[in-house]
Swiss-Prot record:
PANTHER family: HISTIDINE--TRNA LIGASE, MITOCHONDRIAL-RELATED, HISTIDYL-TRNA SYNTHETASE. Belongs to the class-II aminoacyl-tRNA synthetase family. Its EC number is 6.1.1.21. It comes from Clostridium kluyveri (strain ATCC 8527 / DSM 555 / NBRC 12016 / NCIMB 10680 / K1). This is Histidine--tRNA ligase. Gene3D superfamilies: Anticodon-binding domain (3.40.50.800), Bira Bifunctional Protein, Domain 2 (3.30.930.10). GO terms for cellular component: cytoplasm. The keyword NADP does not apply. It catalyses: tRNA(His) + L-histidine + ATP = L-histidyl-tRNA(His) + AMP + diphosphate + H(+). The lineage of its organism: Bacteria, Bacillati, Bacillota, Clostridia, Eubacteriales. Disulfide bonds: none annotated. GO terms for biological process: histidyl-tRNA aminoacylation.
Amino acid sequence: MAIQAPKGTKDILPTESYKWHYLEDKFKNIADSYGYREIRTPVFEYTELFQRGVGETTDVVQKEMYTFLDRAGRSLTLKPEGTSPAVRAFVEGSLYNEAQPTKLFYFTPVLRYENVQKGRLREHHQFGIEAFGSREASLDAEVISLAMRIYEELGVDGIELNINSIGCSKCRKEYNDILKTFLSKQYDNICDTCKTRFHKNPMRILDCKEKSCREIVKDAPLMLHHLCDECREHFESLKMYLEGLGIGYKINPLIVRGLDYYSKTVFEIINKNITICGGGRYDYLIEEVGGPKMPAVGFGMGIERTLLTLSENGIEIPKLPYIDLYIGIIGDKARIKALTLTNKLREKNVRCEYDHMNRSVKAEMKYANKINARFTVILGENEIESGIAKFKRMEDGQQFEISLGDLSAILNLTRM
C-alpha cells in the first residue's frame, strides 16, 4: 500500500500553487503599503509559550496541540497559532527598543489536532498581522482596514465585520463575578468543558459551540454593559475611526475569540456565515511572555479558508503562463541549439523549455498547449542552417520570423 499524507494535511501541487503565490503576493503588497515588515518564526516552540499565552483552559491547549518531548526531555509544541511565536520573537529580538509602533506580518503553517472538515485541516496556513506599541484605537482600526482591504481587492462581496470589546483586566474581573452569578443558576446544564471554564475563565463559556451552552448565554449579562470608562472610550473611538474609514460594522457582544490573550477589541470578518478572519487587541501578552508592559493588536487569516471563500464566491485566480517560450526539436543539432538558446534566455529571466522526450512535432505542440506556453518555435535542420526560425504566438497563431542569433529580438518577443 502506498504511503499517503497524514489525515488533515494536503499537498499543494503545481495545479494549485499558483493560487497561493497570487494570494501571498497580494497579502504582502498590501502589508507593505501599511508599513509592515516580514517576520519568520520556528515551526515549534516551547510548550510553555502557548500554555501561558493562549491559556491553559482553552480548547487549543487542552485538546488540539501537537506536543512532544525532545531527546533532552524538553516539552515542545508545533505551533497552533501565530501570535504567541511572533510576540516571543518580538521580545527575544528586543524589537521593543525600536521606534514604535513595530508592525510585522508573517506566513506560517499552523497545526491543530481538530476534526477534519470542509475548510478546516490539521495543518493549515495563516497570514498574520501584528502591530506593537500603541494603545490607540486608531491602530485597531488600521489593522481591521488592512484585512478588509484584502477582501475588497480580491473582489469578495458580502463581507461582514463583527466587533466587540471584552474589556481590560480591571473591568473584566468585575464582569466575571457578575457572569458567574448568572451562570451558577445554570451550572448543571452547561457542558463539562464549560464547568472547568466556569472556575478559571467564565467568559470563555460565551464562545462555547455546544447547543445547550449557546442557549444559556443568550440571556447572559454582556461585557459591553460593564466596561470601565477607559475601555468604553476605547471602543467608542474604534467605532468612530471605522466610520471615518467608511467601514461598516456590526456589534456582536458574544464575540470573545478562543484564545485567552485578547483584551479590549476583538473582531471577526464573516462571509456566508463563516468566519474567514479574526483578531483583536492583546495588551498583556508581551508582558506574559517576559517582555515589557506593552500593548499590541493583530489578526490571523487562513489561506486555505480564503481560497475556499474565493471559490464559493465564484472568483477565479488568474493563471499566469507557465512558460514564455517552448522550443520543439527535430534532430541532434537542433537539440544543441535549443540547449544554448534556452540557457541564454533563462539568464535573462525568460521562462523557457525545450523537448526532452523526443516527441513528434504534433505531440510537441500539444504539450506546449498543456503547459500554457505563450510562444513556440520548432527547430529543425532548415532553421539551424538558415539561422532563422518562425516563432508562433499561441494565443492567436501569429508568426514572427526572427534570427536565432538576435537574442534581443527574441527577448522583446517573449516580453510582448
